[in-house]
């Protein structure tokens, strides 16, 4: 595999060392392969999995965890065999999938047989996606172009929104159908807004007053 030399040698990233304890660490930037891209991160949203592990509710995922996977940024370098992407493109991160197994080839990347990166250690002893970083090296299959006008924080929702759209397609939602969404957390709201965009009549259930008010503010 051809190795691409880049000027940037180090990356800084957020690391969850244990429940409620975070640190900023430095590591060598991984060497780029011919199908990889180097991204300068603009934003990385905090997913429920990240927050849950910070609170100690997902300690089974293990520590130290270099979390963050709902991000967006700007391409700074491309591998020699990367197609469709150029330096300066704004991109969002996608789900980490191998692209080779039967599930990936059938369009079910969310069920990838080799994507459980949370259970894998990097060569220097960390777990995770390294999204909470200034720079990332990722396979080009893990990114998608975004409009230049789209705010970076909104672009970071591409990965969870893709999950929602997949689910809406699986239930074959149709305009004017009544759909019930249980819970007005982040994913519940994304489901409700997506179903509304599909033309469905949405009933959203929630017991927490602050989440109810938040849902109302979004229409």
Model-flagged regions — what are they?
Residues 142-152:
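Glycine/charged-rich beta-loop-alpha catalytic/anionic-binding loops adjacent to active sites
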Residues 47, 94-144:
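Cysteine-cluster motifs in flexible loop/terminal segments that predominantly coordinate metals
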Residues 18, 42, 78, 184, ...:
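Cofactor-binding loop segments of dinucleotide-utilizing enzymes, especially the Rossmann-like FAD-
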Residues 30-44, 57-105, 147-149:
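Glycine-rich beta-strand-centered segment in the early N-terminal region that forms part
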Residues 1-72, 134:
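Short N-terminal strand-loop motif that marks the start
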Residues 150-219:
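Mid-domain Rossmann-like dinucleotide-binding core that forms the NAD(H)/NADP(H) cofactor-binding site
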């Amino acid at each position: 595999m051809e190795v691409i030399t880049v000027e940037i040698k180090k990356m800084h990233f957020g690391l969850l060392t244990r429940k409620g304890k975070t640190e900023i660490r430095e590591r060598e930037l991984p060497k780029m392969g011919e199908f990889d891209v180097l991204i300068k991160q603009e934003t990385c949203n905090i997913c429920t999995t990240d927050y849950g592990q910070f609170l100690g509710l997902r300690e089974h995922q293990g520590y130290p965890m270099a979390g963050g996977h709902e991000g967006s940024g700007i391409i700074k370098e491309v591998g020699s065999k990367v197609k469709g992407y150029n330096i300066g493109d704004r991109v969002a991160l996608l789900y980490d999938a191998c692209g080779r197994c039967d599930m990936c080839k059938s369009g079910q990347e969310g069920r990838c047989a080799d994507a459980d990166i949370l259970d894998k250690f990097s060569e220097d002893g960390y777990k995770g996606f390294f999204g909470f970083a200034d720079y990332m090296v990722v396979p080009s299959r893990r990114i998608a172009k975004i409009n230049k006008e789209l705010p970076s924080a909104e672009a970071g929702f591409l990965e969870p929104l893709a999950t929602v759209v997949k689910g809406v397609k699986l239930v074959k939602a149709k305009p004017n159908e009544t759909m019930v969404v249980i819970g007005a957390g982040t994913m519940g709201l994304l489901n409700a807004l997506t179903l509304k965009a599909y033309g469905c009549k949405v009933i959203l259930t929630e017991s927490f007053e602050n989440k109810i008010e938040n849902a109302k503010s979004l229409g």
